[in-house]
Amino acid sequence: LFFSAPSGISAVNRLFMNKPKLVVILGPTASGKTSLVVELALNFHGEIISADSVQVYRGLDVGTAKPSAGERRRVPHHLIDILDPDQEYSAALFRRHADEVIHRLHLKEIPIFVAGGTGLYLKGLNRGLFRGPAGDAQLRASMYQRAESVGEGDLYQELQRLDPEAACRIHPHDVFRIIRALEVCTLAGKPISHFQREHGFRESPYEILKIGLYREREELYRRIESRVEKMLEMGWVEEVQSLLGRGYSPQLKSMHSLGYKHIVSHLSGEIGLTRAIDLIKRDTRRYAKRQITWFKTDPEIHWFPADQNGEAEIEAIVMDFFNHC
């Protein structure tokens, strides 16, 4: 990626009298977000906030495709490596942490870029999140135990009965979101979909430019498969083995992240390595498809091809966004 040095960036100073401006670079996994946002942030002398639900964890490096050490030296990154793998994280915590970083950078008049593929995090940053009941550790533990003993399908069937609207939006194997939805039903006496509808929309505290990267499906799938192979060469299996050896439970939410749970299954002898690799590739393709479906519902996204043909236009739009008051 190559960008010419921006001219007229001094006009950016005027925007800091108004709402903070965020340039959000989004797209499905393996679309090329990281390299683009690093070059943009470097060119505009900005900093990057990661909106990734797993890159927050220390030690989960290879399988989360964190920016390289070189990229992080070139451009400051925020909300990466802020938690241990056994700590809980959520969209609400991300919103709070991101707000703090944005406020700090805005006061310093530093252009702010956001990179991520976790749609809920980006939505919460833009429009806020509904306020449901606080979690109940004992209730969650009992539901996790139930999922282990009879399977998550039993929990999903209960959710379909109690909150069919939410069940339609949650994958049958997404045990964490299933349990959260059931937890809200139990504690509040109302389905989580009720709170989501009640929340509605409010004005964003930020001015946001959303830039989406797309690739043809066949090309995206090739990149996904190639990246999985590269991650394995970089020591993904050894990374998971190290985490388990340090005492982190395979039942942790972080260890159920995309790909990690299959490597755990391999290391425990449940499946062979070839089978684990096939499952990782399959689930990553499915995850990318869900991301695309989520992003397609947002009319505010400006889509560009994830190749050099769109770079100049992206740079011009970002420049105009920062300079427009």
Where do the PLM segments sit?
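Phosphate/pyrophosphate-binding catalytic cores of soluble transferases and nucleic-acid-acting enzymes
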Residues: 3, 13-325
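Intrinsically disordered, low-complexity proline-rich regions
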Residues: 4-8
